[in-house]
Amino acid sequence: MFRILMFLATNIAVMVLISLVFSLFGFQGLLAQNGVDLDLQALLVYSAVIGFSGSIISLLISKFMAKRSMNVHVLEHPENDTERWLLRTVERQAEQANIGMPEVGIFVHASPNAFATGWNKNNALVAVSTGLLENMTQSEVEAVLAHEISHVANGDMVTMTLIQGVLNTFVVFLSRVIGHVVDRVVFKVERGHGPAFWIVSIISQVILGILASMIVMWFSRYREFRADAGGASIAGRNNMIAALKRLKQNQDAPPMPEEMAAFAISAGKVQKLFSSHPPLDKRIEALQKG
């Protein structure tokens, strides 16, 4: 509940802050003097609705979509020792992290990987790949599970949604302002919106969206260090380091699907600025430094 309240409070605070900034600097008056009749408050509300709607809906259906896209087999009735061990381990770690028992699942994938998702820490899903179970020792798997449990306990899914929603709001808002200014000032359109508004708005939204995604990925990399530290506190630092080293040995395995990469423990080899995960060497180094 606290995170939801923070989510709503931040959304409102962002809208109020932008309104104050534009009022203090007389931005709307400046636009009016140049023939740009733009209701910034209405546009801001519109942008927030558009910006947060997709993020919130994605969060609420994240478990359903993860199960569907990865074809996750949820362990409701464990059929073998491995499945029973997985359930016991996650249950113990969830108690240590003071969260509700997540659903536990297995998905078929050659890459040793795992992910956690869900709209709150008491309604989450933790899933591991068959490649993880086949290529790691129990202590290493335990460390990976602890890493994912830490993501849930830290509320990373909600925080990512909050950040994405705020950035989406800025992207939609600024792209519309830029399009409107170009339409009125450069092309002298006096009523409605001409083609320039839509073209410039779309181009601006793409460019600003790319910049926003870099910020989201920066935070995602930061949260991986936190989850590693949390995993180490639950499963032991040496086990966490060993698990990351094992992942490093398997970096050439097939990567996770793009839509799930940000939730996995390892995202494979991607460009640094757009990577959801820090390099494994840096994560290992951070754990070794304590």
Swiss-Prot record:
Top EC class for this record: hydrolase
Domain of life per record: Bacteria
Pfam families in the record: Peptidase_M48 (PF01435)
Signal peptide limits: none
EC number(s) stated in the UniProt entry for this protein: 3.4.24.-
Keyword Cell inner membrane among UniProt keywords: yes
Record-linked Gene3D superfamilies: Metalloproteases ('zincins'), catalytic domain
Example of a GO biological process term: proteolysis
Subcellular location: Cell inner membrane
Family the entry assigns: Belongs to the peptidase M48B family.
HAMAP family: Pept_M48_protease_HtpX (MF_00188)
Protein name: Protease HtpX
Organism per entry: Pseudoalteromonas atlantica (strain T6c / ATCC BAA-1087)
Gene this protein is translated from: htpX
